[in-house]
């Protein structure tokens, strides 16, 4: 009898916790519905670009990425149209001292900018010397409502020009630290999808396809097993398909997509990819490895009022510990700068950068980064890139 009563009490506690989570998300849904429309950068007299250098190799590669951005936007910076503003307070040491993943004053400084470019942040893991804080990246995305993670993958010699749209807030991650430990034997985590959340990421993918001459969107789910959440995501994509003549939806399962992404016959003709949060996190990393590694890939986190651009690799502790931080590959963060430059209205300058990077990393390769002392430093590679530009 005592065991049964214990279980009943555990159920009541779990239901109470679950109820709180549901009530919070009803409020979040209403906030999404009431949110203002997308910011038009053409109407802004002044654009502030916030810079968050990050941890580990972050400050080293950010210095080089800023050199490239300042060169490409030299006229805009000189005229006062564009301002680069470094935001302090986000090193792991500073965050650990306050035991805050995202200090309030840092968030306010971020909100005072129009777009952000960030290096990698440490997210503490078990065994690290830091407090067990939640991901600062996730908190930034939610606070600024950066619902679309957009990751381009280009492999020109294979005819690959892909763009991935990953839902950036919901799914398994939104309640990632709010699971319920029902009792010693049972733990429950959650996967969340809201209709407004699904609609805005799906529309972002379709709008991109329409504006860039793309004819298909591949929706990647596990809807054959995860019937409600993944099923509703897929239904939302098909409903929007009717609004975009000339753009068709292709369905793929996430396990097949991850297994066959390097199979050119399987991916033939694919252009734009649309994925829920967790699947997008995994598949885009696989695609980045196919492109040449995480050091070559960038991510754009897009919302209606703010946008954040970043490298998708980690902090490079190994390089720092072996006094090789200056040999880190800056290409991922330089590409992120290019995406930022396009987002604020200078797509032609981004294309100039993409072409120069192709020359420097694929065709000419006069200066090569190996991340070891037998290769070029980040500064030497950036000198080469600027000469090419």
Regions inferred by a protein language model and the residue ranges of each:
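N-terminal phosphate-binding or glycine-rich loops at protein starts, especially the Walker A/P-loop
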Residues: 11-85
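Glycine-rich phosphate/pyrophosphate-binding loop and the adjoining helix
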Residues: 18-21, 25-28, 32-33, 175-178, ...
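N-terminal beta-loop-helix "entrance" segment that forms/cooperates
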Residues: 78-103, 259
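N-terminal glycine-rich phosphate/adenylate-binding segment common to multiple enzyme folds
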Residues: 93-183, 187-188, 278-280
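Buried hydrophobic positions in well-ordered alpha/beta secondary-structure cores of metabolic enzymes
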Residues: 55-58, 114, 165, 205, ...
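Glycine-rich phosphate/nucleotide-binding loop
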Residues: 20, 262-364
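Glycine-rich phosphate/diphosphate-binding loop of Rossmann-like nucleotide-binding domains
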Residues: 50-66, 71-73, 182-256
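Active-site rim loops that border cofactor/substrate pockets in soluble metabolic enzymes
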Residues: 88-92, 229-273, 277-281
